[in-house]
Amino acid sequence: MQQGSAPNSAPKISFVSLGCPKALVDSERIITRLRAEGYELARKHDGADVVIVNTCGFLDSAKQESLAAIGSAMAENGKVIVTGCMGAEPEQIEQAYPGVLSITGPQQYESVLDAVHRASPPVHNPHLDLVPPQGIKLTPRHYAYLKISEGCNNRCSFCIIPKLRGDLVSRPAADVLREAERLVAAGVKELLVISQDTSAYGLDIKYAESPWKDRSVRARFLDLARELGELGAWVRLHYVYPYPHVDEVIGLMTDGKVLPYLDIPFQHASPNVLKAMRRPAAQDKTLDRIKAWRGACPDLALRSTFIVGFPGETDEDFAYLLDWLDEAEIDRLGCFKYEPVAGATSNALPGQVPDEVKQERWNALMARQQKISARRLKRKVGTRQQIIIDEVGPTVAKGRSKADAPEIDGAVYLSSRRPLRAGEIVTAKIERADEYDLHGTVAGF
């Protein structure tokens, strides 16, 4: 039986964070609040006074991972607080683990704190109740996720995020910029801008202005990106929908204000499938825009995600997607095999695709993308690239170019004549490329 903390000592919290970067930011905010109240983080469940599990509920596989994490926490500790997307529909958790102390949905920070207080009241200690101005971060010190809004106004047929996280709620621009400035002052070299729909930022608050330094800044995608680009850090834009006004940020990339990188979840290319998904269907125009973007900014890297085996997807639809990829030349790609999600309207669509066909299409798409990636990376051999160092090994350092986001994209492996540090940005000569990664030598600091 775990003992927890000694009387009058700081209570200890064990934390499990699952799911996407948006959920990670939620975890960081909860931990920051708890540290400000004097709670300490425990390395193991059995050394904690209470365990918090921040769940993911987007796919059934993610729900199973969340349930397994709750089960482990119950077995090792017994005092468990559940929050996050799966907590928005608590029935499955209540049935599996009726003994959990509390279940709340995403962004319910006050409810989580109240549950922690009931399970293990805070003990004030002026030497412990100190939190850095940028808050507690769960990422390496040199990069951080910057969440600019919550929720989503889109109603894609395969997605239940609006049910779990609600409609779009944008933060005031000045609030975002103050957080970004604190992060950069604390040594963050790369800001990863995230939300459910980054390009819709400010729509819900009618692009309201807020005071920032000696001026007012509108809560608008372009305006926010421009101001973030003045802070001196790499700025990487994630979860951008291909709305026409996205064209406006390409100029900031050309000018070096934000990274030449767009993460756009196209999901498919066939008009028939996109219509069934309730996604923008003018992908012929999207190809023209991609060409225009790259014409203005040749270094632009595009990342995207796609779903194969969506209900009603025919062989012709899939062939259309492969042809579209050949023309679009997406640099970085993630692919998912469609799976039903409880509550999604796509579950009722006709033409469910057999699992073996989903697997065949996934294999074919990834093989095609591997060739595209290898071809695009080969063009970088002989060039000089700025690289941010993530890890330093005995002989080789691992970093990322401006075309690579952490954890989801490729890497650059470098040799150097002098020791390197994580977070350092160096100039490297690229000497070799494989399907997904680059290899080179540090040529400047």
UniProtKB/Swiss-Prot annotation:
Cofactor(s) demanded: [4Fe-4S] cluster
Residues in MTTase N-terminal domain copies: 11-121
GO biological process terms on file: tRNA modification
Reaction(s) the record says it catalyses: L-aspartate(89)-[ribosomal protein uS12]-hydrogen + (sulfur carrier)-SH + AH2 + 2 S-adenosyl-L-methionine = 3-methylsulfanyl-L-aspartate(89)-[ribosomal protein uS12]-hydrogen + (sulfur carrier)-H + 5'-deoxyadenosine + L-methionine + A + S-adenosyl-L-homocysteine + 2 H(+)
Keywords of the record: 4Fe-4S, Cytoplasm, Iron, Iron-sulfur, Metal-binding, S-adenosyl-L-methionine, Transferase
GO CC term, one of those recorded: cytosol
A single MF term (Gene Ontology): aspartic acid methylthiotransferase activity
Main location: cytoplasm
Enzyme class: transferase
Function: Catalyzes the methylthiolation of an aspartic acid residue of ribosomal protein uS12.
Family note: Belongs to the methylthiotransferase family. RimO subfamily.
Listed name of the protein: Ribosomal protein uS12 methylthiotransferase RimO
Annotated source species: Bradyrhizobium sp. (strain ORS 278)
